[in-house]
Regions:
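Catalytic core of membrane glycerolipid acyltransferases/transacylases, capturing the structured
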Residues: 111-150
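Membrane-anchoring hydrophobic helices of lipid-metabolizing enzymes
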Residues: 2-119
């Protein structure tokens, strides 16, 4: 029951953020939410996981370098978060994505060869599948659903 209430409160907050983002527009929203996330992100319990992962990534990482990476990570999360509500805009415009190795993509289409595309949480990862679909390539996407059902 408490989890459901938490999810409901979280969803209201998210919807308010999305509404605010739509009102402010893409560029201003990116600035505001990257700043907001870099300010409040470090207070969450994920801070310990992030620091542990950075230690695994680079054994002798300095505190300055670690702090810079974490701040940039939270800024990136803030921009990615608010970009969700602008996916319709991105779908209509191509200036935001550059495809490296597009010849490989065309070859796979011309010769009807199957291809596996691998992505992760690198900025706005939804854009990859959106651009591939625009090229009229049949695509199956595997993902884990959100915990919050609201």
């Amino acid at each position: 029951m408490i989890k459901t209430i938490n999810y409901f409160i979280q969803s209201i907050l998210i919807y308010l953020f999305f509404l605010t983002g739509r009102i402010l527009g893409l560029n201003l929203s990116r600035k505001i939410f990257s700043s907001l996330f870099s300010t409040i992100g470090p207070i969450f319990k994920s801070k310990l996981i992030i620091e542990k992962n950075l230690e695994i990534f680079k054994k002798n990482i300095s505190e300055i370098e670690k702090s810079k990476i974490i701040k940039n990570m939270w800024k990136n999360y803030g921009m990615t978060f608010i970009e969700y509500i602008f996916l319709d805009y991105f779908k209509k415009n191509n200036f935001h994505v550059t495809i490296n190795g597009e010849d490989n993509l065309k070859d796979s289409m011309n010769y009807n060869r199957p291809v596996i595309f691998v992505s992760g949480h690198f900025a706005n990862f939804e854009l990859m599948s959106m651009e591939i679909t625009k090229k009229k390539i049949n695509l199956a996407t595997i993902y884990r659903p959100l915990n919050n059902f609201f």
